[in-house]
Amino acid sequence: MAKRDGAARAGVHAAPVVRVEDGRKVMRVGGVIQSVAVDERYASDVWDAMLPRRQPASALILGLGGGAIAQLMTRRWGPLPMVGVELDPAVVWLARREFGLDQLPHLSIVTADAFAWVAQEAQEARGEQCFDAICVDLYTAGKLAHGVLGASFLRDVRRLLTPRGEVAFNLWRSAYLADQLRRIERVFNVSALDEADDNLIVHAAPRHD
C-alpha cells in the first residue's frame, strides 16, 4: 500500500478525509494514505524510516501532511525546533484538529508551495545553512511531485542543510528509480537506502566537491 505523508504544490485537489482503519486514525487524499496517527501500538513504517540517523538540532519537513514525521521526531528527541511546509490548508486544519499538531509548539507550520518556499529560503540564507535534517515527502495525487528531483530544487535543499546535515527523500519504487537515484547522487552522497512497503527512503548528505 502506498503511504505518502506530504502534499507538494498545486495540481489535482482532492479533499482530505480522516477515517479510522484497523483501529488507527488515517488521513487519505484521493484514496492514498497521507498520514497516520502516531501510536505506540503500531509501527509507522515509511515515516519511521525517514527519521535522521542522529539527533538533529533542527528539522525541516517538506510535505508536512498530518504531521507523522513531526510527531515521531518529538517522541524520539523531544521538542526540537521544526518547520513543516504544507500546501493544502485543509490538510493543515485536519492535522491540527485530528492529529494533535497544536500540541507541538516547537513546530512552525507554513502553508505554502514547498518548491517556492525552498527557493526563497535558499536565496535568503546566503550561505547560512539552517537545518540539520530535511525530510522531502512531496506527492501530488499519489505521484511524486514534479520537480522534486530537479537540479535546482536539489541544490536549494542542499543550501538549507548544515554541513553535516542529512536529507531523506521518500521515493516510490518504480521503473524510474535508478534514474531518480542518479539525480540525487549528483548533489548528495547517498548514505543509506531503506525499504518500507512500496516506498524507498533515500538518506543522503550534502556533497562538498
Regions found by a protein language model. Give the residues of each.
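Active-site capping/gating segments
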Residues: 2-9, 176-209
